[in-house]
């Protein structure tokens, strides 16, 4: 942890070692210390996590009303600890395995508490599998935001499981994958097969199951080919239009890359050689402005 802080130029970070669940170190007298922001990547599915902590927790993280995380899976113990450690205007992001989205019994009760009763969950981002060392299971990022909870009408979900590149035995998020997630999250707009705002009423009808494929359908794996383009050349306008999220961010880039085909309506001509596309993008004014943000 100290090495991580040094690498991020945080030389005076306060680091405490201990059992977060059973013996919290950050406290104000007999209650948990609260923070404006929390980022966490707790160990996945910790077993036998309940030791000195009580079922009726003295820090009010869980109880019979909220729900008590099962002893064989400590994921919600960490998430509820984070919720309790946030100020009323606080925001948190926590990486957890996908199982927290759909496992039943006590965990379903906790999801109902977080989604419907308190409305703390602002969003869920589904990540590709095999990103983390030591496990190949897919993870998700759960975003907690307390400040606007009272007026929250639903949960914004992003399905980013297909955005990655192979890097040896593991998968890795590329810069464009991260940028796409960030752009769509900031815009909070629906994108077919990728992002969607799901109402609390719809989640309730699904018994508070938050499994992303229930709400965002996967794209057809069949790649449709334009035979006319193969036979006579040109880039189908439909294919270029599908990249609208990039043209929205960099509106001038489209005209720098493409022009209308000289003889065929509905098709474009690439204005540069294929190997020069990356250079054109890198030098585009709108792209450079986005990179500086």
Where are these regions (language model features)?
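A conserved structural/catalytic subdomain of Rossmann-like adenosyl-cofactor enzymes
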Residues: 17, 32-293
């Amino acid at each position: 942890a100290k090495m991580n802080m040094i690498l991020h130029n945080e030389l005076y970070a306060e680091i405490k070692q201990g059992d977060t669940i059973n013996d919290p170190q950050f406290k104000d007298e007999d209650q948990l210390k609260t923070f404006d922001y929390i980022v966490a990547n707790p160990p996945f599915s910790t077993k036998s996590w309940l030791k000195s902590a009580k079922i009726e927790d003295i820090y009010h993280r869980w109880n019979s009303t909220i729900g008590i995380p099962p002893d064989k899976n400590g994921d919600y113990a960490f998430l509820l600890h984070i919720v309790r450690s946030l100020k009323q205007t606080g925001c948190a992001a926590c990486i957890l395995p996908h199982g927290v989205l759909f496992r039943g019994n006590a965990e379903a009760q906790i999801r109902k508490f977080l989604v419907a009763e308190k409305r703390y969950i602002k969003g869920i981002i589904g990540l590709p599998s095999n990103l983390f060392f030591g496990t190949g299971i897919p993870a998700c990022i759960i975003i907690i935001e307390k400040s606007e909870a009272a007026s929250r009408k639903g949960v914004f979900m992003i399905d980013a499981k297909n955005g990655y590149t192979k890097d040896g035995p593991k998968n890795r998020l590329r810069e464009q994958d991260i940028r796409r997630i960030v752009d769509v999250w900031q815009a909070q707009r629906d994108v077919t097969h990728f992002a969607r705002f799901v109402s609390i009423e719809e989640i309730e009808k699904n018994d508070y199951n938050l499994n992303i494929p229930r709400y965002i359908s996967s794209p057809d794996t069949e790649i449709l080919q334009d035979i006319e383009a193969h036979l006579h050349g040109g880039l189908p306008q439909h294919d270029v239009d599908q990249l609208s999220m990039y043209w929205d961010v960099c509106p001038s880039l489209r005209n720098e890359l493409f022009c209308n085909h000289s003889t065929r309506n509905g098709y474009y001509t690439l204005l540069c050689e294929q190997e020069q596309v990356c250079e054109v993008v890198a030098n585009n004014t709108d792209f450079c402005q986005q990179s500086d943000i």
